[in-house]
């Protein structure tokens, strides 16, 4: 039993450490990017805009797709790098959540009876 307690304490200490690291990195990103929580009016404005854009896209998908391509071509190298970094962060956090949820890096645990292959 003491072996399991020692192992659990190790996992707990690692979880605390990485939580603190994540909080500190998040604070630095929050400050450096000048982030702030949105106001209710900003949230409403964004969702109303998204709704209008979705309706426009549904009505004229070809025109909307051409506009999207035009915007993509107008982005600078710095913007592509910044958005690429955001994408990598999102994928990394999603993957971390998947790993935590599965409790292993690859595949899903099987809780049923084990099959024997001959």
From Swiss-Prot:
GO cellular component: mitochondrial inner membrane; proton-transporting ATP synthase complex
Residues passing through the membrane, by range: none
Keyword annotations of the record: ATP synthesis, CF(0), Hydrogen ion transport, Ion transport, Membrane, Mitochondrion, Mitochondrion inner membrane, Transport
Compartments where located: Mitochondrion inner membrane
Pfam families: ATP-synt_G
UniProt-listed InterPro entries: ATP_synth_F0_gsu_mt (IPR006808)
One Gene Ontology biological process: proton motive force-driven ATP synthesis
Keyword check for Repeat: no
Gene Ontology molecular function terms on file: proton transmembrane transporter activity
Keyword DNA-binding belongs to the record: no
Function: Mitochondrial membrane ATP synthase (F(1)F(0) ATP synthase or Complex V) produces ATP from ADP in the presence of a proton gradient across the membrane which is generated by electron transport complexes of the respiratory chain. F-type ATP synthases consist of two structural domains, F(1) - containing the extramembraneous catalytic core, and F(0) - containing the membrane proton channel, linked together by a central stalk and a peripheral stalk.
Subunit and partners: F-type ATP synthases have 2 components, the catalytic core F(1) and the membrane-embedded component F(0), linked together by a central stalk and a peripheral stalk. The central stalk, also called rotor shaft, is often seen as part of F(1). The peripheral stalk is seen as part of F(0). F(0) contains the membrane channel next to the rotor. F-type ATP synthases form dimers but each monomer functions independently in ATP generation.
Family as reported in the entry's similarity comment: Belongs to the ATPase g subunit family.
Protein name: ATP synthase subunit g, mitochondrial
Source organism: Pichia angusta (Yeast)
